[in-house]
């Protein structure tokens, strides 16, 4: 998926007011990973999706080729709005995908 142009980046907040993606990002002990993920989000904002793939139920996976194989899960809530759902790495990928799908369904049920 390659798009050029400005994309609005938003972060999913649970019904309990928890920003799941931000909580995960700041908990990373690998500071280089933190920087690389932050840069990918900035690139995403400019329309550069790079290495990503669709999963299911409208959830996508943004892959960061560093360390543990970090992933950022997101959904598109419009043509120009990306909702960051959660993150993880290759080791927790299956669980993270299930969480991301549940978060996106929750978001759509509450917001859309």
Please report, for each region that a protein language model flagged, where it lies by residue.
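Short, surface-exposed beta-strand/loop micro-motifs that present aromatic residues
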Residues: 71-75
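Basic, Lys/Arg-enriched alpha-helical interface segments
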Residues: 1-68, 78-82, 89-112
């Amino acid at each position: 998926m390659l798009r050029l142009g400005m994309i609005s980046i938003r972060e999913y907040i649970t019904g309990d007011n928890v920003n799941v993606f931000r909580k995960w990002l700041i908990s990373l002990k690998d500071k280089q990973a933190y920087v690389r993920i932050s840069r990918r989000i900035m690139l995403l904002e400019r329309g550069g999706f790079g290495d990503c793939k669709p999963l299911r139920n409208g959830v996508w996976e943004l892959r960061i080729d560093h360390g543990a194989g970090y992933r950022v899960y997101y959904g598109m809530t419009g043509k120009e709005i990306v909702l960051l759902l959660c993150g993880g790495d290759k080791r927790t990928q299956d669980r993270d995908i299930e969480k991301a799908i549940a978060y996106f369904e929750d978001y759509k049920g509450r917001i859309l």
